[in-house]
Amino acid sequence: MTDNGTKDCKPASAKRYWWKAAASFLTVLFTMPLGHALMIIMEHAMNETALHYSAFAMGAAGMIMVIAGVYAKGDTRQTLWGFFGGLLFWTGWVEFLFMYYANRYGTQPQLDPVTGEIVTRPEYLIMPASFGFWMMVMLMYIFSTKNGCNFINWWQRRILRNRKNEIAARPMTRHTSIVTFMELIMILWGSYLLLMFCYDDNFLGDHHPVTLLVGLGCLIGSFFIFAKQLRIASWGANIRMAIATVVVFWTPVEIMGRMNLFNEIWIAPMEHKTEMGIVVAAFAALVIYLCAAARKKKKAVH
């Protein structure tokens, strides 16, 4: 998904950076439930008009943060700008916009036939319609960019074969903030598409063996990605790798939640204030630490 360059993803040595990998992983991981909780709180706290304006402003703020990251100094700072800007962009201009048009044109949620509870919200039911746009971006990355993304490189080796260096000869202009932003958006988007196609009874269904295998495969895959992340010395590159680790890891979490194997506290944050408060506090502490680490690194360079 990125044009990181191989230097970001390739381990510099056999040394393992447990604290950097754990801190990066947890920082990204905490954004998953917090993002869900934020959407639900906004829906309950705002009227419809205020919600739509706030969501659009959120997406705009995210875009501004990503652009600001282009001008920021330091790899870690640029990564953080791209990451947090990307989260606001995705929530405001993707998820909330899908919600707006799903509600405006009367898309009905998918209900549990036994309990009558909502199992899939309308905005996610229509999201698979964007598959063609996702593939359009992927075609550009596979055929037109030389980059350090293992997923894209895997496809390039199989599609382009011995002409890989000829067809995908050059990387894009590299801005770390944009790299992080695009990585986050494409991986989140791809994971939602994968889950929605798996949940669709016309394709598989949420209890289909293939859906369970997808969850198991992603769980196992996340450990392999984390093993690579452990060997990355740079904070910025470690955080970027953590995005892939977390989103792949979160896929089986979503599947298990869909099967009611555990209680998803983030879909009812007001009923789990203590637990969500702990997550917010831990997340804030990690973000402050990462910002301090970025500032310290910048001073060391100067």
Give, region by region, the residue ranges found by the protein language model:
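N-terminal signal-anchor module of multipass membrane proteins
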Residues: T2-T49
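Loop-to-helix transition at the N-terminal end of transmembrane alpha-helices
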Residues: M46-G62, L80, D206-V214
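Membrane-interface helix-loop-helix junctions at boundaries between adjacent transmembrane segments
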Residues: A72-A169
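Central hydrophobic cores of alpha-helical transmembrane segments in multi-pass inner-membrane proteins
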Residues: M32-H36, A57-Y71
